[in-house]
Structures are given as structure tokens and as C-alpha cells.
Amino acid sequence: MNTSQPALHTSMLTSLPLLARGKVRDNYAVGIDRILMVASDRLSAFDVIMGEPIPGKGALLTQMALFWFDKLGPKGLNLCPIHLTGDAPESVVTAAEVPQVTGRSMLVKRLKPLPVEAVVRGYLAGSGWKEYQHNGAVCGVKLPAGLQNASKLPEPIYTPAAKAAAGDHDENITFEQTVEMIGLDLATRIRDISIAIYKAASEIARAKGIIIADTKFEFGLDADGTLTLMDEVLTPDSSRFWPAESYQEGINPPSFDKQFVRDWLEQVQVNGKPWNKTPPAPRVPDEVIAKTAAKYQEALTRLIG
């Protein structure tokens, strides 16, 4: 991971109007039809932003997202229109602000976001495994009996979520509920495109020694109503990546993401008690930051080289 640049916890561009700060990205308006997305080095876990950044994380997430947009969009498999404009982020900020955006930003079309998180699961893991143990289904999708933790599913399943307000948890919903929200045509297209992207990406990643257990996509509509893939795509922040060589059904594989931080937060004590997963977050030790950075870097190195 490139740590030669100082870590960027929060971008401070004054030449463009700030639209929003998400858990990781800061979005700025560029005219009325474009957005500059700056991926900071912030880390969130349990929907709480940590005070300590992960040096190089924003650049890594951007590089990986651009890799996937290239593979899956019009230049590659052409599975779906994408939100990239092709314009250089550096071209819309002042010279003094260039270091804040270089390598960690995307200049994208301003879309109307759809209120559905398009989640695709190819393996049983995390909250899906917990739900399956309880009722034999995941988000209303009935699954065969006898599956174990980390089992590969017979076919990838689509388990959408409703986007929550900032700071809240996304809510798992059924496909039928997405139809009520956005109509049958859009709901069906999002489902079918999401599964197609997941299958294609899984093959590409598997050849590089990475299993994509699950992932989430976001879509929006452009001025012409064209369904467009947006935000980040297939990064360790939006996906569960496992090393293929250590995969074993029945156990939690190590993952190339912030699981290391999550595990540390699960056992850390604050004033003699377990942290209650509300702000402020406990201070993350340098060792945990370094190991988390190494996990992200390993995923990128495997995928891109």
C-alpha cells in the first residue's frame, strides 16, 4: 500500500461545493451534472467511523474500483453502463488541492441514486449464516438444508437491502419489496445485472486466488433514465474477499478487509466494559492499523499485481 503520501482522514476542498461526507467518501459538486468522489483513508466498522485513518486505503479502493469498472463496463464485458466520465479529477480542482485528489478520486456522472442496495451472495457467511441457522433462509430466500458456515450456494442469490439514512444500518428487504419501491422493470433489471456482474467478477477473481463471498452494488439513473452502475464496486469495503487457498467449508476464512479491526473491536474494553459500538470509537492501535492496511494491500496485489 502506498504510504508515501500522508493519510487523508478528511478532504478539505474549498474550490468545489461539498455535497456530502459518507463513511469513506467525500462528494463534491462539479457543475450540475458531475460529482468528484474523493475516497479518504477513513475506516468505519459497525457503522462508526474510526478516528485513525488507514494510510493509502482511499487510493487502493479507487484503484480497485477502476479495475472492475474497466473489466465490467463498456471497455470490457459491457454488462452495464457505468458512472465514470473519463475526465481527470485533477482538472476540476485548484493546483494546491491536487494532492488531496490524485490517485484517490473519480469524476463521475451525477445520477439519481436508487434506494436499493443490490446485495449478491455466492457463499453463506456473516449475517446470512446466522439467519440461515435460525430459519433456513437468507432475506426470504429459502436455501437447501445441511449447509455450513462458508458453504458455497448452489447459485448466487440476490438479497437486497433498503438504503438507510446516514449512521443507520441498511435494512434487509425482499425482492418483492424492491418492486414496490422502484417498480417491476427496474427491480428485475437491477437483480439480473447484479447477479451477472457477480458471476463474471467471481470468475476473474477466482483465477487470481480470491473468492468473492458476497458483495453489494449501487445503481442510479442518468438524465435519460439509463440504469447505471455507480459508487464503488467490488472493493474490500463493499465485498467479502477470501483467499482461495485457505478456504474450507465450515469455518470462517480470513478475509481481505476490515475484519481484523472488527475482531479487535469485539474484544476491546472501554472503561472496563466491552465497547458498545456507538461513537466515539476507541483508539485503534498502530499494530491493528498496519495489519488492516496489509490485508487491503494483499487483495489489490493479488487482483492487479
Curated annotation (Swiss-Prot):
EC number: 6.3.2.6
Domain of life the protein comes from: Bacteria
Disulfide bridge partners, by residue number: none
Keyword Nucleotide-binding: yes
Reaction(s) catalysed (UniProt annotation): 5-amino-1-(5-phospho-D-ribosyl)imidazole-4-carboxylate + L-aspartate + ATP = (2S)-2-[5-amino-1-(5-phospho-beta-D-ribosyl)imidazole-4-carboxamido]succinate + ADP + phosphate + 2 H(+)
One annotated Gene Ontology cellular component of this protein: cytoplasm
Keywords: ATP-binding, Ligase, Nucleotide-binding, Purine biosynthesis
Swiss-Prot/TrEMBL GO biological process terms: 'de novo' IMP biosynthetic process
PANTHER family: PHOSPHORIBOSYLAMINOIMIDAZOLE-SUCCINOCARBOXAMIDE SYNTHASE (PTHR43700:SF1)
Family: Belongs to the SAICAR synthetase family.
NCBIfam families membership: PRK13961.1, purC
Name the UniProt record assigns to this protein: Phosphoribosylaminoimidazole-succinocarboxamide synthase
Organism per entry: Albidiferax ferrireducens (strain ATCC BAA-621 / DSM 15236 / T118)
